[in-house]
Amino acid sequence: MKFTLSWLKDHLDTTASVDEIAEALTDLGLEVEGIENPAARLAGFTLAHVKSASQHPDADRLRVCVVETNEGEKQIVCGAPNAREGITVVLAKPGDYVPGIDVTLSVGNIRGVESHGMMCSERELELSDEHDGIIELPSGEVGERFIDWLAENDPAKVDPVIEIAITPNRPDALGVAGIARDLAARGIGTLKTRAYAPVPGDFDCPIKVTIDEDTRDGCPLFTGRLIRDVRNGPSPQWLQDQLRAIGLRPISALVDITNYMTYDHNRPLHVFDADKVKGNLRVHRAAGGETLKALDEKEYTFQPGMMVISDDEGAESIAGIMGGDATGCTEETVNVFLESAYWDNVQIALAGRALKINSDARYRFERGVDPAYTLEGLEHATQMILDICGGEASTVVIAGAVPDHSRAYKLDAERVRSLVGMDIPESEQRQTLTRLGFRLEGNMAHVPSWRPDVQGEADLVEEVARIASLTKLVGRPLPRLTDGVPKPVMTPQQRRLSMARRTAASLGYNECVSYTFIDQASAALFGGGTDATMLENPISSEMSHMRPDLLPGLLAAAARNQARGFADLALFEAGPVFHGGEPGEQRAQIAGLLVGRTGPKDVHGAARAVDLYDAKADAEAVLAAMGAPAKVQILRDGDGWWHPGRHGRICLGPKKVLGVFGELHPRVLQAMDVKGPAVAFVLWPEEVPLPRKSGTTRAALALRDLQAVERDFAFVVDAGVEALTLVNAAAGADKALIEDVRVFDEFIGGSLGEGKKSLAITVRLQPTETTLKEKDIEAVSAKIVEKVAKATGGTLRG
């Protein structure tokens, strides 16, 4: 919501500065998002007088001017066609920043002639698009600040523009009058009350309006009147300036008046060209399939049940959202029908979302407008049209009635203290509510029609506290139930996630926090995107489904970083993923993503691309931090978004999956617009077994008194035999002595023959009772060879 300071002062008698107003608005809950003050960018420019202007000796289109400034006479080279002796101009000196051309001036040399400054055009000062010549002022003293001259002669050019963020519960603040009311209640000036007398009708309105019975819940009230013999030319300069200041383009007097009413009083209106309306108007629900070309020149198809305004020949307006092109006003329009109606906010929101139309009218109606101002807004707009466009007005046609909005709640002065903790005198509380438009009868506060958000006694307390300022609230420490510093309360799952985050960060990963909603295509890549995870009311089409995995968010972040030149990335995230709407279909997950290289090239060699072993090592480190057992199995056959043959599942047995690591499928990387190589891991903290003991200290490391022995074995097996099968067989030969089995070599080809390979392992034997003798080692070795042969069909390589 944007408005200018002068516009605000139309409703508020105040001497407060822009900064004071901005601070008060933010404190009142109307957060100021920005202030555009033209005076700030024009502060350095001064007025000067051209004493002489002669032809440049080396350029036909340039003139050498002698300019009188507050620092004496200066020579300036100028190419403007209107640069001549005797005019008063706006001067930019060396060192001044000229916003329209984004240049800080310095003393220049133009074709051999020095130039000590610049005489500015309106476009160079961002005052307008005019750039045919330099600014000529009808008055002004040499050295006078240009902003001071503008403030006196053309104040709209230096009128500050304030932009505030409006929360959905404050539709009254979508009008400048509502903002002024809040400021007046705070004490930042006095509210200017305006009474708009009804405009008497000079003739009966020839256009009648009816509302179908099944549509009255969506349109309780419709008012309108015919105004004939209007002149729809350009609107007055003051109106054009106000609209331009807030980013609206002036179109014509009639359209500008309706736009003004929208922002001034949060009262959207619509103007029909009455000569194009065929017969009477009817508010009804669409049967479905009807089409209408709207004012944005797009054609829309109505769904069954949408509210429509039709004449005798068909639909002419999308009710409460946008008018039709066929009955729109042009410069030739002389007779108009002015509409002011009250529409149900929910039905307008549903229709606008279905038709994908974002208009000022929809934005306001779906948040709620003042139902009691419907007729008064019509009278106000009628008077503006008569004043600006001329003409004569008919009597008002009214269909329906103002919906009952009356409600009252008890004002309990003690509730402010109990709910907010502020001591505010009862008289001040009553005065605050009165200034906000509440009507007090005894201890009952009647809510004004423009405040649909006030729905109970607690809301009255909020209004009182908001106007008094919550910055005055004094903090009080909570009472302690126990002495000393309380211990943090964390569940085992929370402790695991915290430790996992710290470990991933210590490994060099940057934490991401992404949306839990993603688009359907991305969700489908990772096993989701079904109706079970589709949102009923998504923020946008790109956020239509709950995420089935954390990797889509990490890949999207990687794609954005790569698009900005960051090729090497290490990202992780911890959060929930979803496979349905039931509690058991939501799980916690930790995911990490490595993209690009592990580091830059250096004196030790070239940069190394990330591989699946990087992801494996990091996954094991995070699992260890969460308390996972050291001995796990690495199995094949992960999900389809992993590269086949280049990933593994970290398991405790065939069914207990702790996580997955490996390369991502090239198809997934291409779909997510990520340039590889890319490896990742995902972990399931809930699958990590809890420790049997609840002690917080880790057991001391047990060192063996007896020396361990290592023996190497090389087995020739079929090419299809997995190394894990061989390792498990060797480890099971003697579980009491064999502490560890590791693969250290694989060989294919040579004398082994077709379909064979050699796998070499190191077996570590750790005695517990006595030192191993050679015969003991040989006995264990024989068991290992026997077990491997039985499990894999392999033979010891000679």
Swiss-Prot record:
* Catalytic activity of the protein: tRNA(Phe) + L-phenylalanine + ATP = L-phenylalanyl-tRNA(Phe) + AMP + diphosphate + H(+)
Domain spans labelled B5: 404-475
PROSITE patterns, sorted: B5, FDX_ACB, TRBD
Where it sits in the cell: the answer is: Cytoplasm
Q: Where does Mg(2+) bind?
A: D453, D459, E462, E463
Q: Does the keyword Transit peptide apply?
A: no
Quote the cellular component terms of the Gene Ontology held in the record: phenylalanine-tRNA ligase complex
| Pfam families, sorted | B3_4, B5, FDX-ACB, tRNA_bind, tRNA_synthFbeta
Domain tRNA-binding, first and last residues per copy = 39-147
Signal peptide: which range, if any? none
Domain of life of the source: Bacteria
Main location per the UniProt record: cytoplasm
Q: Which UniProt keywords apply?
A: Aminoacyl-tRNA synthetase, ATP-binding, Cytoplasm, Ligase, Magnesium, Metal-binding, Nucleotide-binding, Protein biosynthesis, RNA-binding, tRNA-binding
Q: Which residues form the FDX-ACB domain?
A: 704-797
Keyword rRNA-binding attributed: no
Any single biological process term in GO: phenylalanyl-tRNA aminoacylation
Which cofactor is recorded for it? Mg(2+)
What are the GO MF terms of this UniProt record?
ATP binding; magnesium ion binding; phenylalanine-tRNA ligase activity; tRNA binding
Q: How does it assemble?
A: Tetramer of two alpha and two beta subunits.
Q: Known NCBIfam families for this protein?
A: pheT_bact, YtpR
Task: Give the family this protein belongs to, as stated in its UniProt record.
Answer: Belongs to the phenylalanyl-tRNA synthetase beta subunit family. Type 1 subfamily.
According to UniProt, the name of this protein is Phenylalanine--tRNA ligase beta subunit
Natural source organism? Ruegeria pomeroyi (strain ATCC 700808 / DSM 15171 / DSS-3)
